[in-house]
Regions:
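Conserved class I S-adenosyl-L-methionine
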Residues: 2-68, 82-86, 168-209, 251
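Class I SAM-dependent methyltransferase SAM/SAH-binding core
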Residues: 72-76, 80-129
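A short acidic, Gly/Pro-enriched loop at the edge of an enzyme's catalytic core
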Residues: 128-139
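A short SAM/SAH-binding and catalytic strip from SAM-dependent methyltransferases
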Residues: 139-151
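A short glycine-rich, Lys/Arg-flanked "PGG" loop and its adjoining helix->strand segment in the class I
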Residues: 153-165
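Short alpha-helix
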Residues: 224-241, 247
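Core SAM-dependent methyltransferase catalytic element
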Residues: 257-282
Length: 282
């Protein structure tokens, strides 16, 4: 049963960024096993086909995915390697970045079993400080990552830097922790999340109660917890040099089961597509 939570209205003062980043990495290092289990579940059910269709159709909308072969794709916050499996199977050359060394290890193992490891290169580093030259990637993707950014404008600016002119950015995320700062959303969530069995996930995929509390504490210190998205993203991306910014607020209907859509009814998954402008702004 979902627990009640007393919402706060304003973010606390920013803490030391380096210390906070270490806390985030430590959290995901400790979550890597259960998070990898959830990815393994997705590989074996309807999620894999749904995500493959949704992701590849956005990368190559007019080519029946044939043109994805050879594309240089950067996955930001790769976690246990779900996108790496999809993308490497389609022939993309994938660079996978995550700040958690344990997540990278899980991803390596999962890609070795289910993907094409010859096409995947892993980098353990911060997604806002990338070890790549400018304008080198055809596509950048991220799933369930942007909400975690202490400085989301810095993150988007860095991702824009490494994209080729005309390259595409695909962001999949949700207002995961809006219930912490909105009492009305929290009350709706409590009803939606009364029974987790509707998710039909394996027991090994769930975070522990302690991990959930720790993640909530981190979320309260992150700026995007206090924004309404994807409206916020749509408002800032053009100023960073992105064109053709589009958001799909019903994206979860394409990749989630009915149970997941019900359980996470207050935080549906959205998709953002944006293109790096081909000409430099004056």
């Amino acid at each position: 049963m979902a627990k009640e939570f007393t919402a706060v209205k304003e973010p606390p003062a920013a803490s030391d960024e380096a210390v906070f980043r270490r806390e985030v990495v430590d959290y995901w290092d400790k979550r890597s096993d259960t998070y990898s289990n959830s990815i393994k579940d997705e590989l074996g059910d309807v999620h894999f086909g749904a995500w493959s269709e949704a992701l590849l159709s956005r990368i190559c909308p007019c080519s029946a995915y044939a043109a994805s072969e050879g594309l240089k794709v950067l996955d930001l916050g790769c976690g246990p390697g779900f996108f790496e499996i999809i993308l490497s199977r389609s022939g993309c050359s994938v660079h996978a970045v995550d700040s958690s060394a344990q997540m990278i290890e899980q991803a390596r193992a999962n890609v070795s079993l289910s993907g094409n490891p010859a096409l995947v290169e892993f980098h353990c580093c911060d997604v806002t400080e990338l070890p790549f030259d400018a304008s080198v990637f055809d596509v950048v993707v991220s799933r369930n990552v942007t909400w975690l950014m202490p400085d989301p404008l810095k993150a988007y600016s860095e991702w824009h830097r490494v994209l080729k002119p005309g390259g595409k950015m695909l962001v999949f995320d949700a207002n995961w922790y809006s219930y912490l700062v909105d009492d009305q959303i929290n009350q709706l969530r409590l009803g939606d999340q009364d029974d987790s069995s509707i998710l039909e996930w394996s027991e090994q995929s769930f975070a522990t109660s302690e991990q959930e509390r720790r993640c909530e504490a981190l979320a309260l210190r992150l700026p995007l917890t206090y924004e309404r998205r994807p409206a916020w993203d749509e408002s800032v991306l053009p100023s960073l040099g992105f064109d053709e910014v589009r958001a799909d607020e019903r994206f979860s209907e394409l990749v989630w089961t009915e149970g997941e859509q019900s359980y996470y009814g207050t935080s549906p998954l959205f998709a953002i597509e944006a293109q790096k402008a081909c000409l430099a702004r004056a």
